A protein has these predicted regions:
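Short S/T/G- and acidic-enriched coil/turn segments that sit immediately N-terminal to beta-strands
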Residues: 242, 422, 451-452, 541-546
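Short beta-strand elements bearing conserved aromatic residues within extracellular beta-rich modules
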Residues: 170, 424-426, 522-524
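Short beta-strand segments within Ig-like beta-sandwich modules, predominantly Fibronectin type-III
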Residues: 442-445, 536-542
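Beta-rich carbohydrate-recognition and catalytic domains
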Residues: 22-208, 220-267, 282-283, 289-335, ...
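Aromatic, loop-rich ligand-recognition surfaces of beta-strand-rich domains
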Residues: 370-439, 449-497, 502-504, 514, ...
């Protein structure tokens, strides 16, 4: 080979390697794998932790922009799957807080989210550059703002974050510096936790503390106005988004029968509130929301996204079914689909035997297979001699992996830190003796704290081994190492003994069933009609559920199924709760 041919071949290898390293996949998995920022507005606590919350996602000129609380910039994507961070020329010194964003006719992108609550609306026609300018006026007392400009070019602002005040709204004069037209705002949405069970505060809605309403967002669809809001609190598993529907931007609005429309209280990654809804590839809507982690600090959070639909009756719903398992990516979900595109790959690693090179006593390696986002393993040292090995117990077909890294007792990371990366090798074996490389990130420069990797082709494996090389900071701390694919055994049998008893307090229902041999867990589904079972709750390690999210006076219908690493059982339907 001559020198010129050798150089061309070498450059091609580098190019192919760089493409492979990006792992552009046909699926995605929550939590979203973003290079989350380390906020410093709580630096007095002395803890460094990543966080991302309150996403405002908009389409602009065929591409997408995501604005996230306290991120010192924002993200850009061409496909709603692969996101690159933008450090704008001008931005909030403290980072934006619960931001608003709106695309005005593909000519100007508007944003606002000053943490002080007093803010000018910012605008630019070049968000990739980020040369933001301010409308020469200041709007006061805005918490969690949401800007909406209707087709008739009338502009509206919605806002509110309180357990005392409602979501309010007012019309703004676009031709006069976006100043309010009326002196007093309209009070639009109040929480009614005495009627709407899901609006009650606390983990599983069990607290008597007054809940919070926040995170407004407006979506116009088929001439109807869908005013969305979050409740009851961002630090709980039941944080979700509800919706009221009206015929005009300022109402009156009617509470939707199906509520909350986006709700993810069970499983690995819980919480789905304070989000935004955007029309993505193929005309499919996507709702982005906030996952609660709340370990280093109560507002330690991550992001999620779910396909969202409007059915033939105009009912808005997000499909959170198997919502933290692999799903088809936005460009793979067809325009005609009425489901969320769950890929059908099951969790092979849940509760499986695991061993490691070392561990701290309070953070054992068993935590990497317990399917709990709040637990993690900590190695004794952060060096290249650390490893984790999972025994799947049976040879299975492995399709994808998710590796979740954690911030444990870190103190030196604030804002957008340079040179963040995780370097490692992932190997697979059928017999525990002969190993093949699945993922080689030993030379990676990518910051991927929730790295989801879809393999080019499924592989046979019983053992999965993580071999550590480098993470920044003092400690190697890992959450779950999740292995997805299909086992070769039997699916669970159909659930028996399924009972649903609605309590005297109609907001609550007690659900129970007989445990199914060989089942990992169960999906309990419910809805306001037999063909509208749009809500679901993943239950691991139990055969009962106290569901406290119902609406007084509303009929509900239920179903249940069991699942394991081999697949999903047939569903059992119960037409109505008694």
């Amino acid at each position: 080979m001559d020198k010129k041919s050798y150089c061309i071949a070498w450059l091609m290898l580098l190019f192919v390697g760089s493409l492979h390293a990006q792992y552009r996949t046909t699926t995605y998995c929550n939590p979203l794998n973003l290079d989350y920022t380390y906020p410093f507005h709580n630096s007095h606590l002395g803890k460094s932790y990543r966080s991302g919350a309150d996403p405002a996602v908009v389409e602009f000129r065929g591409e997408y922009y995501m604005f996230v609380t306290r991120s010192w910039g924002y993200w850009h994507s061409k496909d709603l799957l692969n996101w690159d961070f933008i450090t704008p020329e001008k931005w909030y010194f403290e980072g934006c807080n619960a931001p608003a964003a709106h695309n005005y006719k593909d000519s100007i992108l508007y944003v606002c989210g000053n943490p002080s609550g007093a803010m000018s609306i910012l605008y630019t026609d070049n968000p990739k550059r980020g040369d933001w300018k301010a409308v020469p006026s200041v709007l006061h007392d805005l918490q969690d703002p949401a800007l909406f400009i209707d087709d008739d070019e009338r502009a509206y602002m919605y806002w509110g974050s309180s357990n005392r005040w409602p979501i309010r709204g007012k019309e703004l004069d676009m031709k006069n510096k976006f100043l309010p037209i009326a002196k007093k705002p309209d009070s639009l949405l109040f929480l009614r936790p005495d009627i709407h069970g899901w609006e009650r505060f606390g983990e599983n809605h069990t607290s008597d503390i007054k809940p919070f309403i926040e995170g407004a967002w407006m979506t116009k669809h088929n001439g109807k106005y869908y005013l969305q809001y979050a409740a009851p609190g961002t630090q709980f598993n039941v944080y979700g988004d509800g919706v009221y529907v009206g015929k005009s931007p300022l109402g009156p609005f009617q509470y939707a029968a199906h509520n909350p429309f986006c709700y993810k209280p069970g499983g690995f990654a819980t919480g789905a509130g304070h989000g935004s809804t955007v029309c993505g590839p193929g005309g499919i809507y996507w709702h982005f929301g906030t996952i609660h982690l709340s370990i280093n600090y109560k507002f330690e959070r991550r992001l999620c996204m779910f396909p969202t639909f409007f059915d033939e009756d105009g009912v808005m719903y997000s499909d959170t079914y198997f919502g933290d398992y692999p799903h088809y990516s936005p460009d793979q979900v067809s325009r005609q689909t009425t489901s969320g595109g769950f890929r059908g790959w099951m969790l092979l690693s849940y509760g499986k035997p695991v061993k490691a090179s070392s561990q701290l006593e309070s953070y054992p390696v068993e935590n990497v297979t317990d399917e709990n986002l709040k637990t993690f393993w900590v190695a004794e040292k952060n060096d290249d001699k650390q490893w984790v090995e999972i025994d799947l117990e049976e040879v299975s077909d492995v399709y994808a992996l998710q590796l979740n890294f954690f911030d444990y007792e870190e103190t030196g990371f604030w804002g957008r830190m340079p040179n963040l990366r995780q370097r490692y090798l992932v190997e697979a074996s059928v017999d525990g003796a002969r190993w093949r490389v699945l993922v080689d990130y030993r030379n990676s420069f990518r910051d991927a704290p929730h790295n989801y990797i879809e393999l080019d082709q499924p592989i046979e494996a019983r053992y999965i081994r993580y071999r550590h090389h480098y993470v920044p900071g003092k400690n190697l701390a890992m959450g779950n190492i999740r292995v997805f694919g299909l086992g070769r055994g039997k699916k669970p049998a159909t659930v028996k003994g399924f009972t649903v008893v609605r309590e005297a307090d109609e907001r609550n229902v007690r659900i129970s069933w007989k445990a199914v041999k060989g089942a990992q867990g169960y999906n309990v589904l419910w809805g306001v009609a037999p063909d509208k079972l749009y809500s679901s709750w993943m239950v691991y390690g139990d055969n009962s559920l106290d569901l406290r999210a119902l609406t007084v006076g509303q009929k509900y219908y239920f179903a249940i199924e069991a699942f394991n690493e081999n697949g999903i059982s047939q569903r059992v339907f119960l037409r109505e709760a008694h």
